[in-house]
């Protein structure tokens, strides 16, 4: 007996030494370099796409969008709609757990939608959910949502990245601090959030999709300088970077260890003008500024060709988008219009940007130079996420300092209402939503509201066309470009890519 035990120990020691002779499997840790900071990890209270994209690490919705921006089931298995368009009955996926062990069920859906649709919570995404009259639990796997009025894009709202399912236990535990303590059903859970440096997430062992996630961790690292972001890829400090500085795209494409990807986008870049303030209350001034910008040159100077001049206020790939003849570059016409408007010598103003990365800086400097040619002196300020939240998103019309504002918008629901209503409806002036032009037109408001009440495609087309025709004519914006999305990644990273709305898809990401 003694001899047998000795042999077992010798065998065990031999096995241990043989294991030690081989390296342990390398951890699959990925660093993603992104262009700006995160504002919050509560998707219902984030106005920026990046914060919502990172929140997809922890959170999932009932529905989502695929790479073509078409609705797909996620935590829902299907739905039906009543004949009057008011009631949505949704069947839920069963056997799913939140990261704190709580069950995902109809009660959890109700807790989230009750919170989102309650104006007393003052959530930035409230406007998405204000049409919900009530949410009821039919049984643990079935939830019934009743709307105040028909809303034909409602499933797209439920597919929006903001509509995340948060653990009700976590909501109760953390309250208003839930943005610092995300708990969802997603593939990763929060490990560290250093608010000035990075968000690190780690694999959630109890994730409901078998075999996923394949990565051990993702570190989301804000890197505002374009050149530094690109350099991190080349040195191996990052395995994925977005956005890629356009001027470095060709260089990165030559790197045998990297893959450069230019993908379609619904990201429209524009400058809004505060039409409630002089001189932008004058239509001739707004026309003049549109004639003053050489968009073809802007595409080359700031975007290295990875963009196209805007032909409307809705990107062409969005349903019901209208295209128009682009504004020609005509500084002489611009000066003539300024003279007619009572500003023969131009004027001074401010031009703010919603981002401070290098591409935004180039757009600001280019625009500043173009405006100077027609006598307009623009003082430029590139804002970080905190400044933008405080000075632009957080202030109403009377206290707002916004005059000209360079920013971008992607309709993250994949449909026309979200491309128009948040930016042009009278009810969506900041701080409610993102109508930073403080634009208001009763016919536009009426058309946008009516388009949501009909399921007739021809009537929708008519209403959305009329609204866009009016907006294009009244010019509360200087539409600039629709971007192409340029990202790059290590060739050994697969399944990680950019969505057309500038969000990220990484469900099946792997490091090989």
UniProtKB/Swiss-Prot annotation:
Keyword Phosphoprotein attributed: no
CDD domains, per the entry: PBP2_Ylib_like
Chief place of localization: periplasm
Disulfide bonds: none
A single MF term (Gene Ontology): peptide transmembrane transporter activity
Annotated GO CC locations: ATP-binding cassette (ABC) transporter complex; outer membrane-bounded periplasmic space
Signal peptide stretch: 1-26
Highest taxon above the source species: Bacteria
Keywords assigned by UniProt, alphabetized: Periplasm, Signal, Transport
Subcellular location: Periplasm
Swiss-Prot/TrEMBL GO biological process terms: dipeptide transport
Family label: Belongs to the bacterial solute-binding protein 5 family.
Quaternary context: The complex is composed of two ATP-binding proteins (GsiA), two transmembrane proteins (GsiC and GsiD) and a solute-binding protein (GsiB).
Biological role: Part of the ABC transporter complex GsiABCD involved in glutathione import. Binds glutathione.
Protein known as: Glutathione-binding protein GsiB
Organism name: Salmonella typhi
Gene: gsiB
């Amino acid at each position: 007996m003694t001899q047998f035990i000795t042999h077992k120990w010798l065998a065990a020691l031999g096995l241990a030494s043989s294991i030690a002779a081989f390296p342990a499997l390398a951890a699959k840790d990925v660093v993603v370099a992104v262009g700006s900071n995160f504002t919050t990890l509560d998707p219902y209270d984030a106005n920026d796409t990046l914060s919502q994209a990172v929140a997809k690490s922890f959170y999932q919705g009932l529905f989502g969008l695929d790479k073509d921006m078409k609705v797909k089931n996620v935590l829902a298995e299907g739905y039906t709609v009543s004949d009057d368009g008011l009631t949505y009955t949704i069947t839920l996926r069963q056997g799913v757990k939140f990261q704190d062990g709580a069950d995902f069920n109809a009660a959890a859906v109700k807790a989230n939608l009750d919170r989102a649709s309650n104006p007393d919570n003052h959530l930035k995404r409230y406007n998405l959910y204000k049409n919900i009259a009530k949410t009821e639990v039919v049984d643990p796997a079935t939830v019934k949502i009743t709307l105040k009025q028909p809303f034909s894009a409602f499933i797209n709202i439920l597919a929006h990245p903001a509509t995340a399912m948060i653990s009700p236990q976590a909501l109760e535990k953390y309250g208003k601090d839930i943005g610092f303590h995300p708990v969802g059903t997603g593939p990763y859970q929060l490990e560290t959030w250093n608010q000035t440096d990075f968000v690190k997430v780690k694999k959630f062992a109890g994730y409901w999709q078998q075999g996923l996630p394949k990565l051990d961790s993702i570190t989301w690292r804000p890197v505002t300088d374009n050149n530094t972001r690109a350099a991190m890829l080349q040195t191996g400090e990052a395995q994925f970077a977005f956005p890629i500085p356009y001027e470095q795209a060709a260089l990165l494409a030559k790197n045998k260890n990297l893959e450069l990807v230019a993908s379609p986008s619904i990201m429209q870049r524009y400058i809004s003008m505060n039409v409630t303030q002089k001189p932008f209350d004058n239509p001739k001034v707004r026309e003049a500024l549109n004639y003053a910008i050489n968009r073809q040159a802007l595409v080359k100077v700031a975007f290295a060709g990875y963009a196209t001049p805007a032909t409307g206020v809705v990107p062409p790939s969005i349903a019901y988008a209208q295209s128009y003849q682009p504004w020609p570059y005509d500084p002489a016409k611009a000066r003539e219009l300024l003279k007619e408007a009572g500003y023969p010598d131009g004027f001074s103003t401010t031009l703010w940007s919603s981002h401070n990365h290098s591409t935004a800086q180039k757009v600001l400097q280019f625009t500043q130079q173009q405006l100077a040619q027609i006598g307009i002196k623009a003082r430029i300020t590139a804002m970080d996420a905190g400044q933008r939240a405080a000075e632009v998103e957080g202030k109403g019309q009377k206290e707002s300092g916004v005059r000209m504002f360079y920013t971008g918008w992607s309709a993250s629901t994949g449909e026309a209402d979200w491309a128009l209503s948040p930016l042009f409806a009278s009810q969506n002036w900041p701080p409610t939503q993102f109508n930073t032009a403080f634009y208001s037109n009763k016919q536009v408001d009426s058309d946008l509201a009516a388009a949501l009440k009909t399921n007739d495609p021809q009537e929708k087309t008519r209403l959305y066309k009329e609204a866009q025709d009016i907006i294009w004519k009244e010019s509360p914006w200087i539409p600039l470009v629709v971007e192409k999305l340029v990202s790059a990644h290590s060739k050994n990273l697969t399944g990680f890519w950019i969505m057309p709305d500038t969000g990220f898809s990484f469900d099946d990401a792997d490091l090989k």
